[in-house]
Amino acid sequence: MNEQIGKSIEELRAYNKSLERSPEYQRILPEVMWEVNTQFVKEIIAQEERWLSYKVEEEPIEDDDPIIVEFFKTLRADLKAQDELRKKRIEEAKELLPTDPARAAELLSKLGSCHTLWALQKRILKEKYGITWYTPAELNPDVKFD
């Protein structure tokens, strides 16, 4: 059974390699990646803006333990600082998006983003071009990607 799965994966790898070398794929790839990166950036910006819509609690911290009070004050300050960095990254990405979506996507990428980008690429290739493409994660089930 495992040998059969291994053979199937090897066949899919060969298919992908052949596809990725084809002139047609090479011709459409820049357009596909432009769309992939644009959609990725728009999705991440929407997520980040939703996050920013939440406010850090400003009520006084009531506790008899000064260590706990200091911890929560520090936590609030850290959250506010992270929000400022988040706002700056969003603005930079919005500026880059019309002319360089790849750089905007790179700016907003984080651990695990490769899976989102691959899913978008797979969907766009299938829906727009009728091309079945397999992600590196699908072709390498024993490898952890991030």
Language-model-derived ranges and their functions:
Residues 144-146:
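Short acidic DE-rich linear segments
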Residues 18-29, 97-99:
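Charged, low-complexity interaction regions
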Residues 2-12:
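Short amphipathic alpha-helical heptad-repeat segments
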Residues 10, 14-17, 34, 38:
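Extended, non-membrane alpha-helical segments enriched in charged/polar residues
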Residues 36-91, 98-128, 132-135:
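Acidic, low-complexity, intrinsically disordered interaction modules
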